């Protein structure tokens, strides 16, 4: 098993020193994730590309997923690599691998070459293509729009026959840009905005303002952990939770109805700015889009921005909602966002779309800012890697089982795509598939006289969901860990 990883082209327009630093960081990121998830897979930096190889295909799917979800990679080539003696040897190797592929098909050979050789790339294409055309009678050469394109690369004394081409994530390697603090709510917007900055090379830390109690926090932690685990697990990042209910209570009591939405957003930014300053983070990230809600008009955004000296980044500012949802679907956060409650919109009945500075300041003069400072001081921070551990510790009564008791039902809570790729079938056991994002609404409709064993691939989501269900009063749930 061998993959050739091509870094994003923007890396190569940098100066030599920056290019070397970026590719070294990319190599390190790949190695960290691969070592955490696989065994006996080697990573080598070859200056203009990175090679990932192993003696077996045992971890093929895991490695391919890692490489196609790691920021900074433009494309991943799956190759068969070998030594060669001369042009004819290359032709014979290509014939052995491609003979069956081109039978009764039109084909073309495309070659790239780097190093010192006694032939050019065009000569290589002509020699190999001509040889294949003579050796496979049912095949024919077609230079434009052929059925099969045979791609080969010759690098010094190595021949790479490209078996498959996989699109990478693009962007910059994680850690090449400065850290950011994302104001995450668990909805469509904040998940996508966080992802976009991970893709661009920033370590994204998460700040959650809790307005909905433990269940809301569990849901948001799931989103943050998912984003980190899928796209940025080479980095150590923080999850900070701020209990904002006292702040909301003070706003409801002291601030005029029409100003509540903008004042709440200003309090978010003040608090996030304090958190960012504590960790020496220069910028905040939000999922705000222009005009999406009343607090996101240009006038209101300007009034929101002035309360902190941190740079506020809004990568979705000109996006339509359907565009945001499409990206959420593509990156895997849509299912989380579908069932995430929205709390911010409920506190103002007639929100202003064009706040006035003097009126905002007059309303905030009634606000007790000691409350804001207190909730920030009491904020709880954790290493995002500990979210899985916390789920087990927070709910020690959630039993994990390997054996399935009589009459128990296994609930496969993986997403439909995961379930389709690897269906869970257990002889003699009833298995139901309810995706995790539907569990909260559908679990109550099940036969509550039975015991339900929650299953997911790694056991993280099943523990978090079991905790949530037990908080709702369901004590007939366990975690199935075969």
From Swiss-Prot:
Keyword line: ATP-binding, Cytoplasm, Disulfide bond, Nucleotide-binding, Redox-active center, RNA-binding, Thiamine biosynthesis, Transferase, tRNA-binding
Localization terms from the record: Cytoplasm
MF terms (GO), sorted A to Z: ATP binding; CCA tRNA nucleotidyltransferase activity; tRNA binding; tRNA-uracil-4 sulfurtransferase activity
Enzymatic reactions: [ThiI sulfur-carrier protein]-S-sulfanyl-L-cysteine + a uridine in tRNA + 2 reduced [2Fe-2S]-[ferredoxin] + ATP + H(+) = [ThiI sulfur-carrier protein]-L-cysteine + a 4-thiouridine in tRNA + 2 oxidized [2Fe-2S]-[ferredoxin] + AMP + diphosphate; [ThiS sulfur-carrier protein]-C-terminal Gly-Gly-AMP + S-sulfanyl-L-cysteinyl-[cysteine desulfurase] + AH2 = [ThiS sulfur-carrier protein]-C-terminal-Gly-aminoethanethioate + L-cysteinyl-[cysteine desulfurase] + A + AMP + 2 H(+)
NCBIfam families xref list: ThiI_C_thiazole (TIGR04271), tRNA uracil 4-sulfurtransferase ThiI (TIGR00342)
GO annotations of cellular component type: cytosol
EC numbers on record: 2.8.1.4
Xref: CDD domains: PPase_ThiI (cd01712), RHOD (cd00158), THUMP_ThiI (cd11716)
Sequence ranges assigned to domain THUMP in this UniProt record: 61-165
Entry's Gene Ontology BP terms: thiamine biosynthetic process; thiamine diphosphate biosynthetic process; thiazole biosynthetic process; tRNA 4-thiouridine biosynthesis
Organism domain of life: Bacteria
The keyword Transmembrane is annotated on this UniProt entry: no
Entry binding sites for ATP: 183-184, 265, 287, 296
This protein's name: tRNA sulfurtransferase
Major location (coarse): cytoplasm
Domain Rhodanese: 404-482
């Amino acid at each position: 098993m061998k993959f050739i990883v091509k870094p994003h082209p923007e890396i190569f327009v940098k100066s030599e020193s920056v290019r070397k630093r970026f590719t070294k960081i990319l190599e390190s990121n790949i190695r960290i994730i691969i070592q955490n998830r696989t065994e006996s897979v080697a990573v080598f930096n070859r200056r203009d590309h990175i090679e990932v190889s192993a003696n077996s295909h045992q971890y093929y799917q895991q490695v391919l997923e890692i490489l196609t979800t790691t920021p900074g990679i433009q494309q991943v080539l799956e190759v068969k690599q070998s030594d060669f003696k001369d042009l004819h040897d290359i032709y014979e190797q290509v014939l052995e691998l491609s003979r069956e592929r081109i039978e009764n098909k039109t084909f073309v050979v495309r070659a790239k070459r780097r190093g010192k050789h006694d032939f050019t790339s065009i000569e290589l294409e002509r020699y190999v293509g001509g040889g294949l055309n003579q050796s496979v009678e049912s095949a024919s050469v077609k230079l434009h729009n052929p059925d099969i394109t045979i791609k080969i690369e010759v690098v010094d004394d190595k021949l790479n026959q490209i078996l498959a081409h996989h699109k990478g994530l693009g962007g910059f390697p994680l850690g090449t840009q400065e850290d950011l603090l994302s104001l995450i709510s668990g909805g469509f917007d904040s998940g996508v905005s966080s992802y976009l900055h991970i893709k661009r090379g920033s370590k994204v830390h998460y700040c959650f303002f809790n307005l909905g109690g433990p269940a809301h926090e569990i849901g948001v932690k799931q989103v943050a952990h998912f984003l980190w685990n899928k796209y940025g697990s080479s980095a150590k990042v923080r999850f900070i939770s701020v209990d904002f209910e006292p702040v909301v209570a003070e706003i409801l009591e002291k601030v005029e109805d029409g100003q509540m939405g903008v004042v709440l957003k200003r309090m978010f930014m003040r608090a996030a700015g304090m958190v960012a300053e504590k960790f020496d983070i220069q910028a905040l990230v939000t999922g705000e889009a222009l005009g999406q809600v009343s607090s996101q008009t240009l006038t209101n955004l300007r009034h929101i921005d002035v309360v902190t000296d941190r740079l506020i980044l809004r990568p979705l500012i000109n996006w339509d909602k359907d565009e945001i949802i499409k990206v959420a679907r593509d990156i895997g956060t849509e299912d989380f966002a579908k069932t995430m409650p929205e709390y911010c919109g409920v506190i103002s009945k007639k929100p202003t779309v064009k706040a006035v500075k003097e009126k905002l300041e007059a309303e905030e003069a009634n606000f007790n800012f000691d409350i804001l400072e207190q909730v920030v001081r009491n904020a709880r921070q954790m290493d995002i890697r500990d979210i899985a551990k916390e789920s087990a510790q927070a709910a020690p009564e959630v039993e994990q089982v390997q054996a399935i008791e009589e009459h128990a039902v296994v609930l496969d809570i993986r997403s439909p795509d995961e379930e389709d790729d690897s269906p869970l079938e257990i002889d003699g056991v009833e298995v139901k598939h309810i995706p995790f994002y539907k569990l909260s609404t559908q679990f109550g409709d099940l036969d509550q006289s039975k015991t339900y064993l929650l299953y997911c691939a790694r056991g993280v989501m099943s523990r978090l969901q079991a905790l949530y269900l037990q908080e709702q009063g369901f004590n007939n749930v366990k975690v199935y860990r075969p």
